[in-house]
Swiss-Prot record:
It comes from Mus musculus. InterPro entries: CCDC172. The lineage of its organism: Eukaryota, Metazoa, Chordata, Craniata, Vertebrata. Transmembrane segments: none annotated. Disulfide bonds: none annotated. This is Coiled-coil domain-containing protein 172.
């Protein structure tokens, strides 16, 4: 193979090295972009986790409060049932007393009237009896008013329980939405990690290319052949070109550059 053809191959190899450097830059740029995306996704995930934990804490507090209110509601309902039963009993007793009182009043008035007609006794006792009966009826009416007020209070408490149940449903819906967002962020993080691993593998493949590239191997064999034929000057020139080519094909790593700069010159 002529020296001119060899130089043409070296130039072609330099073009390949430039293409490899371009690919390496693109790979590094893509890795940087993916790392930024992973970092942002991780930060977003952390923020969403904090928000979700806060919402869960609030929901737990509201649930605990709701359970307490339910317990109170059950107690109030039992008390309401007892009050209603007692009210019905009292109303029945009141009605019976009213009927009995009316009958007794009519009978007593008739007896007093008859007795008065017979013996002409004053009617003050009749008036006093009526006043006592009216006072008893007023007491019964007052008890009925107290029962009605207690029933209205129970109805107001039930309205508050309905409002808390509505708030619980809204918090559960918001929790479901946050869980969906969290799943999307986890999927994006997994995808970004897979892309990063692929790019790292591509970077390793490009770094190892000079050791397995057929063109580099062939050039080294030709250098060995020239060295065997004692072509010292041609050998040194080709050796310098090969060193430059290997440097061009190798990844631009500061540690690699430092190690190459301390290697002894080839003879």
């Amino acid at each position: 193979m002529s020296l001119e053809s060899l130089f043409q191959h070296i130039i072609f190899s330099e073009h390949q090295a430039e293409e490899s450097r371009r690919v390496m830059r693109e790979v590094r740029s893509e890795i940087t972009r993916c790392r930024g995306k992973i970092k942002k996704a991780t930060e977003d995930l952390s923020e969403e986790k904090i928000k979700l934990e806060s919402k869960v804490q609030q929901l737990s507090e509201k649930s605990f409060l709701l359970e307490l209110l339910k317990t109170h509601e059950n107690a109030l309902e039992r008390q309401l049932s007892e009050i209603i039963s007692e009210r019905d009993t009292l109303l029945q007793a009141c009605e019976a007393i009213k009927n009995k009182t009316t009958e007794e009043e009519e009978r007593f008035i008739k007896e007093i009237t008859d007795f008065n007609d017979n013996y002409e006794i004053t009617k003050k006792r009749d008036t006093l009896m009526k006043e006592n009966i009216e006072m008893e009826m007023a007491d019964l009416d007052s008890q009925a008013d107290v029962l009605r007020r207690e029933m209205k209070s129970v109805e107001r408490n039930r309205g508050q329980l309905w409002e808390l149940q509505k708030l619980k449903n809204e918090l559960l819906q918001e929790l479901f939405t946050l869980q969906k967002k969290l799943k999307v962020l986890k999927d994006e993080e997994t995808e970004a990690i897979c892309i990063t691993k692929q790019l790292e593998a591509e970077k390793t493949k490009v770094r190892d290319k000079p050791q397995h590239d057929p063109e580099c191997v062939r050039l080294k064999r030709e250098l060995d052949l020239y060295k065997a034929e004692d072509m010292e000057s041609v050998y040194r020139a080709l050796q310098a070109e090969v060193d430059l080519l290997e440097l061009a094909l190798a990844p631009k790593d500061p540690q690699d550059s430092n190690s190459l700069s301390h290697e002894p010159p080839h003879t």
